[in-house]
C-alpha cells in the first residue's frame, strides 16, 4: 500500500469512528437529560472545564510526543526505542494523573464552591478524578499506535470507550431503578472512568 493510500485509509477510519462516536454521544446526551433532568445535567456539564484542564495536564502533550517519537523511531527501524518511548510516556502520564487524581479528590469541595460556584459539584469532581489514570493509559497507547500509522486501533478504542461509557451508565441506572431508587448524576461521571 502506498503512503498516499495509507494516509487516506487512516483518515477514513478515524473519520468513520469519529462519526459513530458522535452519534452515540448524541443519543447519550438525550438519555442523560431524560434520566437525570436538566439541572443534574447542568451540574454534569459544569465540571467539564475542570476535566479538560486536568486531562491536559496529564495527557495532552505526552500523547503528541509519544506519537511523534514513535513515528520517528519506527521509520528508521528502531521499534525497541519506540516501545521505550511508550513506556516512558506511560510512566510520566500515569504518575501525573495519579497526582492530579489525589489533588482533585482532596480539593473537590474547595474547587466546587470557589471556582464552579456550586457545592453540589464536589461529589462529581471527586468521582471524575478516577477517570484520569485510565485516560492517561488510553492517551499514551493511542499516541503509540498513531505513531505507527495503525489508526484502526485508536479508532476502535474510541468507539469502544464510548460504548463502555454509555453501557455503564445505562446499567447503573437500570439497576438503581429496579431497586426503586432514583438514579444519580454521579453515574454519568463514573461512566467517564469506565470509558
Label for each model-derived stretch:
Residues 110, 117-141:
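Alpha-helical transmembrane segments of multi-pass membrane proteins
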Residues 135-157:
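Membrane-interface junctions at transmembrane-helix termini in multi-pass inner-membrane proteins
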Amino acid at each position: 500500500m502506498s503512503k498516499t493510500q495509507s494516509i487516506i485509509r487512516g483518515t477514513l477510519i478515524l473519520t468513520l469512528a469519529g462519526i459513530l462516536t458522535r452519534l452515540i454521544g448524541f443519543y447519550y446526551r438525550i438519555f442523560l437529560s431524560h434520566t437525570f433532568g436538566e439541572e443534574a445535567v447542568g451540574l454534569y456539564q459544569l465540571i467539564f472545564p475542570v476535566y479538560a484542564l486536568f486531562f491536559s495536564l496529564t495527557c495532552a502533550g505526552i500523547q503528541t510526543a509519544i506519537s511523534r517519537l514513535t513515528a520517528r523511531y519506527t521509520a528508521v527501524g528502531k521499534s525497541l526505542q519506540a516501545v521505550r518511548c511508550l513506556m516512558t510516556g506511560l510512566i510520566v502520564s500515569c504518575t501525573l494523573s495519579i497526582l492530579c487524581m489525589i489533588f482533585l479528590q482532596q480539593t473537590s469541595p474547595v474547587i466546587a464552591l470557589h471556582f464552579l460556584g456550586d457545592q453540589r459539584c464536589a461529589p462529581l469532581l471527586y468521582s471524575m478524578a478516577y477517570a484520569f489514570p485510565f485516560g492517561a493509559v488510553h492517551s499514551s497507547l493511542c499516541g503509540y499506535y498513531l505513531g505507527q500509522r495503525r489508526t484502526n486501533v485508536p479508532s476502535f478504542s474510541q468507539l469502544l470507550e464510548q460504548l463502555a461509557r454509555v453501557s455503564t451508565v445505562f446499567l447503573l441506572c437500570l439497576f438503581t431503578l429496579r431497586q426503586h431508587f432514583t438514579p444519580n448524576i454521579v453515574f454519568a461521571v463514573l461512566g467517564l472512568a469506565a470509558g
